[in-house]
């Protein structure tokens, strides 16, 4: 998959290098524990547990050969539009995606407002959810696959480029994502 890149700075030291195929799944697994502790078991898996519980997860690593890593740093093209995506707005769009079973998310500028829209762009009679999240004098529609927006729920400064790439910069943690837009995005 070459449409998402995440970068984070962490203070923890890791015993060994490992690959995770589905990072959102791994993060959700870690979040199941109040005070998670990771124990690396050789080179094939990690045990996630909490000192105050009897539960644990044995989580297997991916083969490093299936992970696509960038060979050079990403240079974000000039932004066409920028806005702040608040955690509450992000949480609501995620709930709408799940509740209405919608595969697409659009960031839409109508010349006045910026809306976040959960939709099925291939089905004109599908249910839609929309919410005004900002203002812009620009007209555009930037499409994402909903599955590509599995990022840490938080506040983000978002930049979108006409070259069909976006940059999500977490406002509270040293985490950022570059997520490709869908080819039918319009500027």
Predicted segment positions?
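Long, charge-dense
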Residues: 64-83
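DNA polymerase processivity clamps
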Residues: 1-59, 79-187
């Amino acid at each position: 998959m070459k449409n998402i890149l995440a970068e984070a700075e962490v203070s923890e030291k890791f015993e060994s290098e490992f690959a995770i195929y589905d990072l959102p799944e791994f993060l959700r697994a870690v979040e199941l524990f109040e005070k998670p502790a990771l124990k690396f078991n050789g080179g094939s898996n990690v045990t996630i547990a909490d000192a105050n519980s009897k539960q644990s997860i044995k989580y297997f690593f991916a083969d490093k050969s299936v992970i696509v890593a960038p060979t050079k740093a990403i240079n974000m093209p000039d932004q066409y539009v920028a806005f702040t995506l608040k955690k509450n707005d992000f949480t609501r769009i995620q709930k709408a995606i799940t509740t209405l079973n919608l595969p697409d998310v659009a960031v839409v500028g109508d010349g006045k407002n910026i809306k976040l829209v959960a939709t099925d762009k291939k089905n004109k009679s599908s249910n839609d959810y929309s919410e005004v999240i900002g203002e812009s004098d620009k007209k555009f529609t930037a499409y994402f696959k909903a599955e590509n927006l599995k990022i840490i729920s938080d506040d983000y400064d978002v930049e979108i480029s006409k070259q069909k790439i976006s940059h999500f910069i977490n406002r509270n943690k040293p985490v950022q994502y570059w997520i490709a837009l869908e080819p039918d995005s319009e500027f």
